[in-house]
Each structure stands twice: as C-alpha cells, then as structure tokens.
C-alpha cells in the first residue's frame, strides 16, 4: 500500500508571503512534493512553472476563474446566461495549463557538446494534471429548488464542452461540492451525491470528483461510508479541520490519522491537498521522535509537512475550508 502524497495549496498556506512564487518556494523548502493554486491568473504561468521546477514541485491543480467577484460570482459552470463567460474562463485556464505543460526542461551544460546548452527533462515537476471546474452560485434572490433543473442543464452542457477541451492536453476536470451550511449558502453543487449523479449524466472519463473532506463532513458526515462509496470517482482530495478550517493538527471534529489510513487502505493514489488556514508562520512545533518511524513527517505551525509521504502524527485532528 502506497503512502499518501501531499500537495500545498499555496492560495491558503504561507499567507505571510506576498506572492505565489514565494509561496511555492516555501512549499518546496518545507518538504512538499506538489502544489496547487486556486486562481493563478495574476502571475505569468511561465514564472509559476519555472519556480515550481526550481524547487522540485509538481503543479497539480488550478481552478477555473471565479467570474465577477464584485458581483458575488464564485464560478460560472452552472450559472444560466453565463455560458459564454464560463467558456472564456475555461479557455483562460486551458491556456495557463498549456504554459505550465510547456516548461518541461531546464538548460544545463552538456559536457560532450563543446559548451552547447542541452536539456534535461523535468516534466514530472511541472505537469499540470487537473482543473477544478467551478459550478458557481444560485443567482441572488432565486429559489434553489425552482432553478435546480435549469442550472443542472447548463452545467451538463458546459461540462461536456469542458471535457472535450481538456482532453486535448490529457487534463482532468474536477467537480467539487462546497458546503452550503457554513461556507457558501448559495453554491449550486453541495453534496457528493449530487456531484456523482452529474458525473454519471455527463459520462466523460476525464471528469472526476474533488473530495474536500471539510465540506463533506459539514454537509453529510458519514465520512467512512462516503469515502468508500465515492472514492472510485475521486481524482483529488483536500483536507482541513471542521469547523474551523484549520490544519489537521488543530482541535476539531475529524480524526485525521484514521481518515488518512482509510484513504491508504482504500487504495487512493492521488494527492491530498492541504487547503486550510494555518495557525502561524514558520518554525516546526513538533517533530517525530525516536521510534516514531511509522509516522514519518513533520508538524509545524502550518500543519502537516509531509516530506516522506507523511501520515499525520497520532495526536492530530482536522478542521474546515473551501
């Protein structure tokens, strides 16, 4: 059974650092092997790919653009009347992913080429794999039940289009249910059951489920049953403690050592994204001592740093976030 692999969500972690490249460097120096970025569109994608490459990080996930944040938009995939804007945003994400895919090698001196520059392939550090296709919110003032069918129809149409676009670069599109009890009361896609039903209707193999354990616990609980039921559809996992959306080491409802073991036992092979609000900056607050080899890793003020496929230390417990 392979140990879990962790990715740093640099839109959440290292908040004391002002730029995404700086956060990527911090993630690399903290022992992460991968990173994900919510909305990378304020930075040149080549710069992000180059930084990730320099510190040995694989970039695994970005989101489609949120739309007009000033008007309260948080994704456009299921929003009636915004189909063209969703497709424009998908194109923007796809173009960004193309840049991240292109920066696959670094120049090095080729000793046998009389000073000419050669290339060493490092695609494993830069290849973007997944794009979260954000569903968006129920329109302001609309009744959720009244617009549900229309929004699902729009979402299905957009997802079929997205699947075709993403297939051109062998990318996977992800659907993430976001809880409507605490985080986003108007978000359209809010349970794994709803997302799984939509995936079945779309019927595209490169569309999968994004399991954020924080949201799933808030909406439905029953994490053991839901993980076992839906894991075959899952392409990516994210974690945070409930209800405070802190790191797995903070007080809360979730028993993360158990959940991480469950994911391993069920054969999950993807990354576990650390998407939480860190308690502090810098410095390790705890390290495994002698005889704790089965729980290899580090725990810091920011939570779990897994340089060797960390399963969080036995005393940890989790919290929530989007």
Please state what every model-predicted region is.
Residues 36, 60-63, 132, 174, ...:
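Conserved beta-strand positions in the central sheet of alpha/beta enzyme cores
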Residues 41-54, 254:
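Active-site-adjacent beta->alpha loops and helix N-cap segments on the catalytic face
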Residues 21, 40-42, 88:
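Aromatic- and glycine-enriched glycan-recognition loops and surfaces
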Residues 12-14, 39-41, 65-68, 135-139, ...:
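Active-site-proximal loop/turn and secondary-structure-junction residues that shape catalytic pockets
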Residues 32-42:
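A short beta-strand-loop structural module common to alpha/beta enzyme folds
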Residues 53-54, 58, 74-208, 218, ...:
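Active-site acidic/histidine proton-transfer and metal-coordination neighborhood
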Residues 26, 30, 61-72, 134-136:
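Short, conserved active-site loops that position catalytic residues or coordinate cofactors/metal ions
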Residues 2-31, 53-56, 92, 113, ...:
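Histidine-acidic metal/acid-base catalytic patches
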């Amino acid at each position: 059974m392979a140990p879990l692999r962790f990715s740093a969500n640099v839109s959440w972690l290292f908040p004391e650092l002002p730029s995404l490249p700086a956060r990527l460097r911090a993630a690399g120096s903290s022992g992460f092997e991968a990173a994900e970025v919510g909305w990378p569109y304020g930075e040149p994608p080549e710069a992000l790919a180059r930084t990730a490459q320099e510190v040995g990080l694989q970039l695994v996930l970005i989101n489609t653009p949120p739309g007009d944040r000033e008007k309260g938009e948080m994704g456009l995939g299921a929003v009636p009347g915004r189909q063209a804007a969703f497709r424009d945003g998908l194109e923007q994400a796809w173009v960004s992913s193309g840049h991240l895919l292109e920066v696959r090698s670094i120049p090095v001196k080729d000793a046998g080429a009389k000073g000419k520059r050669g290339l060493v392939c490092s695609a494993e550090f830069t290849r973007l794999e997944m794009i979260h296709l954000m569903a968006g919110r129920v329109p302001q003032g609309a009744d959720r039940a009244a617009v549900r069918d229309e929004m699902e129809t729009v979402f299905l149409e957009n997802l079929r289009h997205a699947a075709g676009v993403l297939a051109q670069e062998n990318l996977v599109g992800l659907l993430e249910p976001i809880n409507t009890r605490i985080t986003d009361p108007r978000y359209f896609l809010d349970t794994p059951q709803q997302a799984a039903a939509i995936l079945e209707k779309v019927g595209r193999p490169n569309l999968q489920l994004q399991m954020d354990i924080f949201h799933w616990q808030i909406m439905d609980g029953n994490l053991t049953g839901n993980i076992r039921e839906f894991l075959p559809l899952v392409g990516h996992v994210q974690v945070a403690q409930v209800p405070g959306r802190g790191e797995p080491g903070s007080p809360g409802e979730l028993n993360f050592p158990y959940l991480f073991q469950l994911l391993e036992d069920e054969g999950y092979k993807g990354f576990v994204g650390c998407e939480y609000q860190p308690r502090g900056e810098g410095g390790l607050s705890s390290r495994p001592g002698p005889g704790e080899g089965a729980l290899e890793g580090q725990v810091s003020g920011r939570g779990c740093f897994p340089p060797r496929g960390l399963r969080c230390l036995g005393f940890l417990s989790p919290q929530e976030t989007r």
